[in-house]
Amino acid sequence: MEYQELLHQRQSCRAYDPDRPVEQEKILRCLEAVRLSPSACNSQPYHLTACTGKLARQVAPLVQGEAHNDFASQVPCFVVISEAPYNPSAAMHARVTGRDYRSMDIGIAAAHLTLAAADQGLGSCLLGWFDEEKLRALLGLEGEVRLVMALGYACPGDPLREKVRPPLSQLADLIEES
């Protein structure tokens, strides 16, 4: 798939086919895309935990609540992104600049994961609503959970929605030096 087409095809999926598991090789390709993504000082300060089968069914209620993410019970795979330590160089840069590179790196990683999923015909949805304490206990994670991604095949007939975004002129400037 061409990159621009991929950008238009990727959307947050909230209707998954619960009877169609995600093949392990597709999950691994998504994780590999994250491994290859850029990060501050090449630190990759995160850990990915892919959950399928019974474990995915245990994760589902931990990302639901207060009328959020009702679709989670249909999701065949969740990827939990938690923090990992910086490498020494990135840690020093973060201290000196006061910038949270880890958050930036996790955002970059998540973007790569969603695009890799779309490239393989998978739907995805980034979830910021979750019970962190219970997720960490269930998965034995030491680092703070930052994002959970739903991953799976969209239900047949789930429409591709038109993207509603501000015009580029509101988001960007192109400054030319003469």
Regions found by a protein language model. Give the residues of each.
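A glycine-rich helix N-cap at a beta->alpha junction
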Residues: 68-78, 140-161
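Acidic, glycine-rich active-site loops and adjacent beta-strand->loop/helix elements
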Residues: 85-86, 130-133, 152-155
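Short secondary-structure junction motifs
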Residues: 43-46, 119-122, 146
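Small-aliphatic-rich amphipathic alpha-helix that forms the alpha element of a beta-alpha
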Residues: 34-35, 79, 94-138
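N-terminal amphipathic, basic helical "cap/leader" segment at the start of enzyme domains
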Residues: 1-77, 84, 177-178
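Glycine/charged-rich beta-loop-alpha catalytic/anionic-binding loops adjacent to active sites
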Residues: 13-16, 88-101
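C-terminal helix-cap and adjacent tail motif
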Residues: 3-21, 147-178
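Acidic-glycine-rich active-site phosphate/pyrophosphate-binding loop
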Residues: 78-92
